[in-house]
Each structure stands twice: as structure tokens, then as C-alpha cells.
Regions:
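Helix-loop-helix module between adjacent transmembrane segments
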Residues: 75-173, 241-245, 279, 287, ...
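Residue-level recognition of pore/gate-forming positions within transmembrane alpha-helices
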Residues: 13-16, 52-53, 80-84, 131-132, ...
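Membrane-interface helix-loop-helix modules in multi-pass membrane proteins
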Residues: 35-104, 234-245, 252-258, 262-297
């Protein structure tokens, strides 16, 4: 393991924990801890929503799909971009307005209970149970991804890597609450976008350019250049339907609730969609031209 890599990872992890400690002293009440006191700017709102949404999938899952399936995998990107835009356009601002005016609801279950005047609290309980159940699995997958990264990078045992990663994430989350989570996601979003811009450019340069890359792919497997190859109309609809998930993902919706003013939502939407489009295009390019790179290097 090269020393610069170790130093970089250590500095990153220390920064995450430091953010948690900083916001520990900036947190005054439950609203601050759960929703950041509704004081987030449009930039942090947008990038934290994007980073928490895409997470490791943008760096591993989507490139992997493009690598194995070819350009047909871009259908899922279209669905995600359209779904995210509609979510920002139709859900974000009304949700910010309603949650603030309906007894200052600071969670999704609170909002539903207040919005529909549920005096039995049944709606609040059911919503909370659903979120707890499914997001336990969702969060677990993120922790597993982090452990796999530590395992490969630092040659740690998987169980040790899982414990280290979990302790770091849980530490800054419990120390700084929502503000810490949002600001760490903001930093991660910047790093993700930079990596997904630089990496495909390096790969394309290494293989001799876009045209050369396309020729390498065409000679190895022409079907990877066919946007409908190996799928069907139902298959394409299924890929496009991924974008429907945006309308019900609590970790994205709470970002809309926490922006400091609803009038800043349009700016946040512009920042968020710009980040998403650039990052997804970079992710697609990594997987697609990564296939050409592997062939050109003779890697098995």
C-alpha cells in the first residue's frame, strides 16, 4: 500500500469525524439534530441529496452495468435523470412549504400525520416502520460497500473493515446529526463528480481517443454499441422506471425540507441536476470506455 493513498484516506476519515464534532457544538435542539434547523443553502442541499442518492452505486454499479451490457445501460440513466428532475420540480418546493407550516414537521412520518390530521397516529407509526425496515437494509448495503472498499484498499479482514467503516460513519452521524451528514455528503458529492470527470478523460486519452475506443469495442462485441440490444420494450420501461423511486425516498425528501427558504429551491434544482447529469455521464463513460481499456491492455 502506497503511503500517499493511506494518508489521503486517513485525512478524509479524520475530516468526516471533525465535521461531526464541529456540528455537535452547533446543535441546540431536536430540529437542529434531525433537520439542520432548516438552514442549509442550495449548494449543500443539492449535492448532499445527489451524493446520498447515488452513493457507491454511481461509482461501482452503473459503470459495472455499462461494462457488462454496453450502451443499453444508458436507459437507466435517462430514467434517473427524468425522475430526479420531476422530483425537484414538483415535490421539492411544496414539501418544504407544507412541512414548515404544518406544525414544523421535521420528519416524513410527522409530515404525513400532520398533513392528513391523523389523530390516531397510525399513519405516523406505519410510515416510520416502513422506513425503518427498508432503510435498515439500504443502510446495511452502504456499510457493506464501504467495508469492501477498505478490504481492497487496506487489505483488512472484511469484518475489521466493516467495523472501522461503521464506527466512523456512526460517529459523525450521532455527533453532528443532520448537519454533519449533509456536509459530509456535500464533500463526497464534490469528490465523486471530480473523479467521474477526470477518470473517463484519462481512460479515453490512454486508449487513443473516443473513435479508437469505439473501434475497440465494435471489434470485440458490436452489440455493446446497440442501445436496444439484448433487451425488450418491457426491459427498457423497467430501466426507465428506476426514476420513479425518487418520489418516495426519505433520505432525498428530507433534503428538500431542510433548505433555508423555499425560494432557493430553483437554484438548488439547477445545481443538483447539473451535478447529476455530469456525474452520470462520467459514470457511463467509465464503464463503457473501461471495457475498451481492459481489452487494449489485455487484462483478463
Amino acid at each position: 500500500m502506497e503511503t500517499p493513498v493511506i494518508i489521503s484516506f486517513a485525512a478524509y476519515m479524520i475530516t468526516m469525524v471533525a465535521i461531526g464534532i464541529y456540528f455537535y457544538f452547533e446543535t441546540d435542539d431536536l430540529s437542529d439534530f434531525v433537520l439542520g434547523g432548516r438552514r442549509l443553502g442550495p449548494g449543500v442541499t443539492a449535492l448532499s441529496a445527489g451524493a446520498s442518492d447515488m452513493s457507491g452505486w454511481l461509482l461501482l454499479g452503473l459503470p459495472g452495468m455499462m461494462y457488462t451490457d454496453g450502451i443499453v445501460g444508458s436507459w437507466i440513466a435517462v430514467g434517473l435523470i427524468v425522475g430526479a428532475y420531476l422530483n425537484w420540480h414538483y415535490i421539492a418546493r411544496p414539501l418544504r412549504v407544507y412541512t414548515h407550516h404544518l406544525d414544523d414537521a421535521i420528519t416524513i412520518p410527522d409530515y404525513f400525520s400532520n398533513r392528513f390530521e391523523d389523530r390516531t397516529h397510525l399513519l405516523r407509526i406505519v410510515t416510520a416502520v416502513v422506513i425503518l425496515l427498508f432503510y435498515t437494509l439500504y443502510t446495511s448495503s452502504g456499510l457493506v460497500g464501504g467495508a469492501k472498499l477498505f478490504e481492497a484498499t487496506f487489505h483488512l479482514e472484511y469484518s475489521t473493515a466493516l467495523i472501522v467503516g461503521s464506527v466512523i460513519i456512526v460517529s459523525y452521524t450521532f455527533l453532528g446529526g443532520y448537519n454533519a451528514v449533509s456536509w459530509t455528503d456535500f464533500i463526497q458529492g464534490i469528490l465523486m463528480m471530480l473523479a467521474l470527470i477526470v477518470t473517463p478523460l484519462v481512460v479515453i486519452f490512454h486508449i487513443g481517443g473516443i473513435t479508437e475506443g469505439l473501434e475497440i469495442i465494435r471489434s470485440a462485441d458490436p452489440s455493446k454499441l446497440d442501445i436496444i440490444s439484448g433487451t425488450s420494450f418491457i426491459g427498457i420501461l423497467s430501466l426507465l422506471a428506476w426514476g420513479l423511486g425518487y418520489f418516495g425516498q426519505p433520505h432525498i425528501l428530507v433534503r428538500f425540507m431542510s433548505i433555508r427558504h423555499e425560494n432557493e429551491m430553483e437554484r438548488a434544482k439547477t445545481i443538483g441536476m447539473s451535478w447529476m447529469i455530469l456525474s452520470i455521464l462520467g459514470s457511463l463513460a467509465v464503464g463503457f470506455f473501461g471495457f475498451a481499456y481492459v481489452l487494449s491492455e489485455g487484462i483478463d
